[in-house]
A protein has these predicted regions:
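Short, intrinsically disordered terminal segments enriched in charged and Pro/Gly residues
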Residues: 40-79
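Cys/His-rich microdomains that often coordinate metals
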Residues: 10-11, 36
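Short cysteine-rich clusters marking metal-coordination/redox-active sites
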Residues: 3-6, 29-32
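Intrinsically disordered, low-complexity boundary segments flanking structured domains
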Residues: 1-4, 15
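Short Cys/His-centered divalent metal-binding micro-motifs
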Residues: 30-42
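Short linker/helix segments within small regulatory modules
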Residues: 14-26
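Short Cys/His-rich "knuckle" micro-motifs
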Residues: 13-16, 39-41
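Glycine-centered signal
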Residues: 6-7, 21
Length: 79
């Protein structure tokens, strides 16, 4: 299993997280999931400055993103 954001492979006993339903599931490693959770929190609370910082962090982590991840990110967390 690989992370759809950074392309990292699952290690032994490592938990991967998923977002979405059905065929649109996006898988995240724990590090990428942490940034996504922060983006959700920033968006819900209206923190534009933190939202921008976490957007930058997610872009830096996305070294080898899947096309499904890019579509999901643009739909849910546009720049």
């Amino acid at each position: 299993m690989t992370c759809d954001c950074c392309g990292g492979k699952k290690k032994l006993f490592e938990i991967f997280y998923s977002e979405g339903e059905g065929g649109q599931k996006i898988r995240f490693c724990p590090d990428c999931w942490d940034v996504v959770e922060r983006l959700k929190s920033d968006q819900a609370s209206g923190e534009r400055e933190l939202y921008g910082i976490h957007q930058l962090q997610l872009r830096k982590r996305a070294k080898n993103p899947s096309p499904a991840f890019l579509a999901w990110k643009n739909a849910h967390y546009p720049d």
